[in-house]
Swiss-Prot record:
Name of the molecule in the record: Beta-glucosidase 46
Glycosylation positions in this chain: N223, N375
Similarity comment: Belongs to the glycosyl hydrolase 1 family.
Record bears the keyword Transcription regulation: no
Function: Hydrolyzes p-nitrophenyl beta-D-glucoside, p-nitrophenyl beta-D-galactoside and natural glucosides such as salicin, p-coumaryl alcohol glucoside, phenyl-beta-D-glucoside, coniferin, syringin and arbutin. May be involved in lignification by hydrolyzing monolignol glucosides.
SUPFAM superfamilies: (Trans)glycosidases
UniProt gene name: BGLU46
Binding site for a beta-D-glucoside: Q49, H152, N197, E198, Y341, E414, W463, E470, W471, F479
Organism of this sequence: Arabidopsis thaliana (Mouse-ear cress)
């Protein structure tokens, strides 16, 4: 295991070679920082992508364990999360990396099946509770605020086997049970809670295209054994939204007054730019938002689905009962978590027929997502085929959310740059990640601009601290500030780690918050 002294030597060498390059890349023309002293700068992770130890100390099988083992061909490199970054055994080393970066927060998630191997149909795994207690305590000891997500795509396989997980209202009970246990055991120290990560993205991949477990879909969206892409995504989303409200109800009525924390939800966002100035394309861009991020955020904030969805889907969209609407309005989020990576052009498919593609169907809002407008790209393409670099779209997205949701506090819970490891890619090339630095620099400048516009943003978490298991990409796409050798699990800081460290130092003085 790498020692702290080795980290110090590596960062010293980078600091001698890198400062001139770094200083040229960031800072807008206005060098004043809009970040207040209590702003959270951190990195983000998730349990399945990081922990490994997939059957260690009483952990049960989860949906991703089963999916990756039974369908290795669905993962680009045929890999799984059995070991991942092995953070379960190496979290102290990773906390040293965070501490050296100067971050004052770390976003992590709870492995549902590590705490409750069989959901509410089995016993609590107190070895799992102990692991998270140790991790939380170690973070706090170093002055790093834990920002904890209750559910980040993974759940006990038992719940899929019993009642098809998110397709059943029973899942709301199980999620409430998990939330109660986590608040009880960790809430005296955890003051920032996220209920569910990216319900919109999770549902689209699991129940529309069938690319994520439980791999349910129908033609023409995907080729699955079971599922209905026209109806099941909306059923699953309905249950996730109500499970979110259930968790907040438990926190508000049993824990928040004493524990004095806050709780919210995370959605995936993309900026949707109309491909022309026509009214049809402008309306389509708004529909695209309604069928993507607003699908989740409108019920969470206003207790109802967006009008565009109601008008277009009719009876295919579940309805909230009066009691459910009351619950949503009574137990609102304290903040919104915003994950953001890219932008798209949007072409209307409601009035004018257009080619099939992402967004073009009725269940997706009849708003086709495109990355080009004639010969003009929405932004430079990264190694990840869905990610284009468009910092101005990020600024527009934050202002859109500010205006639509009355400037409720926001945290940028994920933002990062993906780099593909090709057969010819060298470790040296991965460590000298200048494209990632340019991406982060542009998006953080856009964040500054949005905050000067008045967006009420309270924190920023780079995705990700480490290279990790990136779902369908396996270990072939790297988002980390630290390189991971997945044979030895050695962590090595990339140039972007030094850049992010310098950015934090230059924008917020948080040294008094960190126990060096």
């Amino acid at each position: 295991m790498k020692t702290f002294a080795n980290f110090a030597i590596l960062f010293l060498l980078q600091s001698l070679l890198f400062p001139l390059y770094s200083s040229c890349l960031h800072q807008t023309s206005d060098d004043s920082s809009p970040f207040p002293s209590d702003f959270l700068f951190g990195t983000a992770s998730s349990a399945f992508q990081y922990e490994g130890a997939f059957l260690t100390d009483g952990k049960g099988l989860n949906n991703w364990d089963v999916f990756a083992h039974e369908n290795p061909g669905k993962i680009v490199d045929g890999s799984n999360g059995d070991i991942a970054t092995d953070q379960y055994h190496r979290y102290m080393e990773d906390i040293q990396s965070m501490n050296f970066l100067g971050v004052n927060s770390y976003r992590l998630s709870i492995s549902w099946s590590r705490v409750l191997p069989n959901g509410r149909f089995g016993v609590i795994n107190y070895k799992g509770i102990k692991y998270y207690n140790n991790l939380i305590d170690a973070l706090i000891k170093k002055g790093i605020t834990p920002f904890v997500t209750l559910n980040h795509f993974d759940y006990p396989q038992e719940l899929e086997n019993r009642f098809k997980s998110w397709l059943s209202s029973e899942m709301q009970k199980d999620f409430g049970y998990l939330a109660d246990i986590c608040f009880k055991h960790f809430g005296d120290r955890v003051k920032h809670w996220i209920t569910i990560n990216e319900p919109n993205q999770h549902i689209s991949l699991a129940y529309r295209s069938g690319l994520f477990p439980p791999a349910r879909c129908s033609m023409p969206y995907g080729n699955c054994t079971h599922g209905n892409s026209e109806t099941e995504p909306f059923i699953a989303a309905h249950n996730m939204i109500l499970a979110h409200a259930k968790a907040i109800q438990i926190y508000r009525t049993k824990y928040q007054r004493e524990q004095k924390g806050i709780i919210g939800i995370v959605v995936q966002t993309s900026w949707f730019e109309p491909i022309s100035d026509s009214i049809a394309d402008k309306n389509a861009a708004e529909r695209a938002q309604s069928f993507y991020s607003n699908w989740i955020l409108d019920p969470v904030v206003y207790g109802k689905y967006p009008e565009e969805m109601v008008n277009l889907l009719g009876s295919a969209l579940p309805k909230f009962s009066s009691n459910e609407m009351n619950s949503l309005m009574s137990y609102k989020s304290d903040f919104l978590g915003i994950n953001h990576y890219t932008s798209y052009f949007i072409q209307d498919c409601l009035i004018t027929a257009c080619n099939s593609g992402d967004g073009a169907s009725k269940s997706e809002g009849l708003a086709l997502k495109l990355d080009r407008k004639g010969n003009v790209s929405i932004g430079e393409l990264t190694d990840v085929n869905w990610q284009h670099i468009d910092p101005n779209g990020f600024r527009k997205m934050l202002n859109y959310l500010k205006n639509r949701y009355h400037n409720i506090p926001m945290y940028i819970t994920e933002n990062g740059f993906g780099q593909l490891q090709k057969p010819e890619t060298t470790v040296e090339e991965l460590l000298h990640d200048t494209k990632r630095i340019q991406y982060l620099s542009g998006y953080l400048d856009a964040l500054k601009a949005a905050m000067r516009d008045g967006a009420n943003v309270k924190g920023y978490f780079a995705w990700s601290l480490l290279d990790n298991f990136e779902w369908l990409y396996g270990y072939k796409v790297r988002f980390g500030l630290f390189h991971v050798d997945f044979t030895t699990l050695k962590r090595t800081p990339k140039q972007s780690a030094t850049w992010y460290k310098n950015f934090i130092e230059q924008n917020v003085n948080i040294e008094d918050q960190i126990d060096k």
